[in-house]
C-alpha cells in the first residue's frame, strides 16, 4: 500500500525530506510511515494542529524532525530551493510551493481558494506571482460549483449562524 518512493519504505539517502502543503489527511496521511530521520517540511501552525490532533484521533501526526515553512521565506534542502506562498484554504496554514533546482522552476499550487477568510492572499499572489515557471503542478478539487444560479454561503455568512446555534445549545 505504501508508494514506491526511494527512501520511504527502504532506507535511501536520496530522500532528503517530505513537504506537506497543509494539514488535510489527503496531504499528510502516509507520513506516519516515514522513517523518523527524514525531516518533514510544513508550516509551524499546521504542525501544531496535527500534533494536537494526536490526542483526539489516530489521524493526527507528529514528526521527530521538522523544518518550518514561512510565507515567501526560502529554505534550502540539498539542491532544492523551496519558497512557500501562504494561500487561502479551508485548512489553516496552507501553502503553494515554488521549488527551484538546476535552473528549473516548478510551482505547486497546493489547495487554494479565492473566497475564504484570507481571500486577500489570492489577490497578493495574482499581483506578485512567482516568475519564470517551467512547470505548473496544479491541484483541482473544485473547478466549478455546478449550476451558476446556485448560491453557496461564504464562511463570513455562516459565522453568525454558528454563533446563534452554539449560544442556543446547552453544554
Regions found by a protein language model. Name each.
Residues 1-19, 25-171:
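His/Asp/Glu-rich metal-coordinating catalytic cores
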